[in-house]
């Protein structure tokens, strides 16, 4: 069994936690990477991400895929879920939401590599896809295609 002391600083895992009111209030937590000497990819998929249009307050929906190659740290998944959920009542344009997620994770984790693909569902007839990446993929690490097809409507 892993040394439980390395998880002592986690405040959200293992108990009831309220959804934060905004991304700024959300607490992202990290844990030590037990495989820090090995390069490998981690993927999180949020197919029902929501935020609000900052002008109309109408809901916006996206399928978000986060891929990263961790260094010394892993993001704690419940804190990531709560962070992503905190956008539900947050007003921001698609581009801002998408890039902010990537930058916040980079700031927290200092990963070797990170990519966010945000595939926004159409509103006003125009789908918007936003991509953020910290640099080229690492040699020798398998990074699968994100698997989200271009929106075609009834096409």
Curated annotation (Swiss-Prot):
Q: Which reaction does it catalyse?
A: 7-aminomethyl-7-carbaguanine + 2 NADP(+) = 7-cyano-7-deazaguanine + 2 NADPH + 3 H(+)
- For the ligand (substrate), the binding residues are 75-77, 94-95
Key words of the record: Cytoplasm, NADP, Oxidoreductase, Queuosine biosynthesis
Say which domain of life the source belongs to.
Bacteria
Q: Which GO terms describe its molecular function?
A: preQ1 synthase activity
One Gene Ontology biological process: queuosine biosynthetic process
Q: Which pathway is it part of?
A: tRNA modification; tRNA-queuosine biosynthesis
List of catalytic residues? 53 (thioimide intermediate), 60 (proton donor)
Could you tell me which SUPFAM superfamilies the record lists for this protein?
Answer: Tetrahydrobiopterin biosynthesis enzymes-like
Gene3D superfamilies reported for this sequence: 3.30.1130.10
One Gene Ontology term, aspect cellular component: cytoplasm
**NCBIfam families to which the protein is assigned, alphabetical:** QueF-II (TIGR03139)
Q: Which PANTHER family match?
A: NADPH-DEPENDENT 7-CYANO-7-DEAZAGUANINE REDUCTASE
Q: What does this protein do?
A: Catalyzes the NADPH-dependent reduction of 7-cyano-7-deazaguanine (preQ0) to 7-aminomethyl-7-deazaguanine (preQ1).
- Which family is this sequence assigned to? Belongs to the GTP cyclohydrolase I family. QueF type 1 subfamily.
What is the protein name stated in its UniProt record? Answer: NADPH-dependent 7-cyano-7-deazaguanine reductase
Q: Which organism is it from?
A: Ruegeria pomeroyi (strain ATCC 700808 / DSM 15171 / DSS-3) (Silicibacter pomeroyi)
């Amino acid at each position: 069994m892993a040394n439980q002391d390395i998880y002592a600083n986690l405040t959200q895992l293992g108990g009831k936690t309220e959804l934060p009111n905004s991304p700024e209030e959300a607490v992202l937590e990290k844990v030590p990477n037990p495989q820090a000497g090995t390069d490998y990819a981690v993927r999180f998929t949020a197919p029902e991400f929501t935020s609000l249009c900052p002008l109309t307050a109408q809901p916006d929906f996206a399928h978000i895929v986060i891929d990263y190659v961790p260094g010394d740290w892993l993001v704690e998944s419940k804190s990531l879920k709560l962070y992503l959920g905190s956008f539900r009542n947050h007003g921001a344009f698609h581009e801002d939401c998408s890039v902010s997620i990537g930058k916040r994770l980079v700031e927290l984790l200092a990963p070797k590599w990170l990519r966010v693909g945000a595939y926004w569902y159409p509103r006003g007839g125009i789908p918007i896809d936003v991509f953020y990446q910290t640099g080229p993929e690492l040699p020798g690490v398998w990074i699968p295609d994100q698997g989200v097809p271009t929106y075609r409507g009834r096409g």
